Curated annotation (Swiss-Prot):
This is Eukaryotic translation initiation factor 3 subunit D-1. It comes from Drosophila persimilis (Fruit fly). The RNA gate region regulates mRNA cap recognition to prevent promiscuous mRNA-binding before assembly of eif3d into the full eukaryotic translation initiation factor 3 (eIF-3) complex. mRNA cap-binding component of the eukaryotic translation initiation factor 3 (eIF-3) complex, which is involved in protein synthesis of a specialized repertoire of mRNAs and, together with other initiation factors, stimulates binding of mRNA and methionyl-tRNAi to the 40S ribosome. The eIF-3 complex specifically targets and initiates translation of a subset of mRNAs involved in cell proliferation. In the eIF-3 complex, eif3d specifically recognizes and binds the 7-methylguanosine cap of a subset of mRNAs. Residues 100-120 have a biased composition (Basic residues). GO terms for cellular component: eukaryotic 43S preinitiation complex; eukaryotic 48S preinitiation complex; eukaryotic translation initiation factor 3 complex; nucleus. It comes from the Eukaryota. The keyword Protein biosynthesis applies. InterPro entries: eIF3d.
Length: 541
């Protein structure tokens, strides 16, 4: 018995497709029926793909780049397809020559005249074709920079302008007396001001520890928290100034106030100073207002206080330099550890019967090989986050490129460095010691390390940072003369937070008198506890 098995029914059949062979080029020989009579638009693979449609938006909000999804291929008229009658595409060709505006004629041509070879005798634009260089004089350079700045402004390029807050809220009952813009203040000058004469010296200074000069990035040292009291007493509360005001001087201030006024043209942030003008007697009120500064300001003050005390030789067995009088801000029944500060009261004659008396400070003293003491002003620069501050990494460049680090700090903190320099010059310090202090972790603002130190002579450093003491004295004398013309009362000088302008206000006598009752409120969110009593920005002269 035999069976016949049909194997053809068990396997699927394979039909060979038709493959067209084009002998004259690439692609198919014939177009399929489904694609006949369809217009063809050339395209590019680099075209950006966007949304097919958006039914939720009625208009295009992206006005800056309205054609960002448009095709970049075939944009010419020869590739465009218009589904309309042929008669509408007919147009006449205008062969008339277009008259150019007169101001565009010869705009960038080589100017040759009586001035010589390619030289404009009137100081215009000289376009020499040597090596493709263009020479601009001063006026044209300023015009070019102005055009560039306007282009950026109208193009809305870059981040939005940062609006800074005012250091104090201007009240409705304050009368504006004068506005002094920075361009006018920069031109002021008061030359030939002699060095101040010492009237009184108070306090005790400790000697500098030279081992801190050997600190570098690889041999860093933690910044310690020094539990010492630094008295920040206002001018009106200073007992020495009250005593000296009976015999000498008619303008009284501190070195910090003078430095703020002298370096006002370099400031960007708002600040304010309270001025009290009285008759021939010093003011009698004993109130001192106090504010809570922001975290970075607190951190910088915290670092400066601890660094200036840590680099000194502390201890009962260590030698100390004592001035003629003790610290005037310590009472006899006070048993506290006071920071190393030396007070030097000096006077300057500014002309026109104006005698300035100011309290200046030294932070330390250094013993020279000859045995003579050298007084020091010790300050600290702090690094909080180089990426956010547009700075350089201190741990990478401090040992090899310290000049680049200092140049970056001069760019970011020009006003602060100038104020430190002016304070050192006014006090007569022999050295200005700068310390470089950085956070251990950029997110931890309570722990720091010392990465290095650097010292300068104050007058030489002032020349390096282009700080003119003649201009500083001129700005101070201008403000003193302006206040002297006013009647007796209380005034406030404030830097505008967003404009290079200083304003003088006539304020009521009871202004800021109630600030002491608000002291300590709103400080719960601060990242640092007050190491000592911080002075308010509203300093009193």
């Amino acid at each position: 018995m035999s069976e016949t098995i049909n194997t053809a029914a068990q396997f699927p059949s394979f039909e060979k497709p038709t493959v067209q062979f084009n002998e004259r080029g690439w692609g198919p020989c014939e177009l399929p029926d489904t694609f006949k009579d369809v217009p063809y638009q050339p395209f590019s693979k680099n075209d950006r793909l966007g949304k097919i449609c958006d039914w939720t938006s009625t208009s295009n909000n992206d006005k800056k780049y309205q054609n960002k999804y448009a095709s970049s291929f075939g944009t010419g008229n020869q590739y465009s397809y218009y589904h309309e009658e042929d008669e509408t595409t007919f147009h006449l060709v205008d062969t008339a020559r277009v008259q150019k505006p007169p101001h565009q004629r010869g705009r960038f041509r080589n100017m040759r005249g009586r001035g010589g070879r390619g030289r404009n005798p009137r100081g215009g634009l000289n376009n020499h074709h040597h090596h493709g260089m263009t020479t601009l004089n001063g006026k044209n350079v300023k015009a070019r920079d102005t055009r560039r700045g306007m282009g950026k402004k109208f193009g809305h390029r870059g981040p939005p302008p940062k609006m800074r807050e005012s250091s104090v809220a201007v009240r409705a009952d304050w009368a504006s007396i004068e506005e002094m813009d920075f361009p006018r203040l920069i031109k002021l000058s008061l030359p030939n001001i002699k060095d101040g004469v010492d009237i009184a010296t108070c306090g005790t200074l400790e000697y500098y520890d030279k081992t801190y000069d050997r600190i570098n990035v690889k041999n860093e040292k933690p910044l310690q928290k020094i539990d010492r009291i630094v008295h920040t007493v206002t001018t009106t509360d200073d007992p020495v100034i009250r005593r000296l005001s009976k015999t000498v001087g008619n303008v009284f201030a501190t070195d910090a106030i003078l430095a703020t006024i002298m370096c006002s043209t370099r400031s960007n942030y708002s600040w304010d100073i309270v001025i009290e003008k009285v008759g021939d007697k010093p003011p009698t009120d004993d109130d001192s207002s106090c504010n809570s500064p922001r975290n970075l300001a607190i951190e910088a003050t915290f670092i400066n206080h601890n660094f200036s005390q840590q680099v000194l030789k502390t201890g009962d067995q260590e030698a100390k330099f004592k001035f003629e009088e003790p610290n005037p801000f310590i009472s006899e029944d006070e048993d506290i550890q006071v920071a190393s500060v030396g007070y030097r009261y000096k006077k300057w004659e500014l002309g026109s019967d104006i005698v300035l008396v100011a309290r200046c400070e030294h932070d330390g003293v250094l013993q020279t090989p000859s045995g003579e003491p050298q007084f020091m002003s010790i300050k600290a620069l702090n690094e909080w986050d180089s990426k956010l501050a547009n700075g350089v990494e201190w741990r990478q460049k401090l040992d090899t490129q310290r000049g680049a680090v200092l140049a970056n700090e001069l760019r970011n903190n020009a006003c602060k460095l100038a104020k430190w320099t002016v304070q050192a010059v006014l006090a007569g310090s022999d050295q200005l010691k700068l310390g470089y202090v950085s956070r251990i972790n950029p997110r931890d603002h309570s722990r720091h390390v010392i990465l290095g130190t650097q010292q300068f002579k104050p007058h030489e450093f002032a020349t390096q940072i282009n700080l003119s003491m003649d201009n500083a004295w001129g700005v101070l004398r201008c403000i003193i003369d302006l206040v002297m013309k006013q009647k007796d009362g209380k005034y406030l000088i404030m830097k505008d937070p967003n404009k290079p302008i200083i304003r003088l206000y006539d304020i009521p006598d009871n202004t800021f008198d109630s600030d002491d009752s608000d002291d300590g409120e709103g400080d719960d969110g601060e990242g640092f506890q007050q190491v000592y009593n911080y002075a308010n920005n509203s300093n009193k002269i």
